[in-house]
């Protein structure tokens, strides 16, 4: 999924 505010999660 797309990154959130300042937080990158695995796709």
UniProtKB/Swiss-Prot annotation:
| Keyword tRNA-binding listed | no
Question: Secreted: is it a keyword of this entry?
Answer: yes
Disulfide pairs here are none
Q: Its GO biological process terms?
A: neuropeptide signaling pathway
One GO term of the cellular component aspect?
A: extracellular region
- What job does this protein perform? FMRFamides and FMRFamide-like peptides are neuropeptides.
Per the record, the similarity remark reads: Belongs to the FARP (FMRF amide related peptide) family.
Q: What is this protein called?
A: Extended FMRFamide-10
Instruction: Cite the source lineage.
Output: Eukaryota, Metazoa, Ecdysozoa, Arthropoda, Hexapoda
């Amino acid at each position: 999924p797309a990154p959130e505010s300042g937080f990158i999660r695995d796709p």
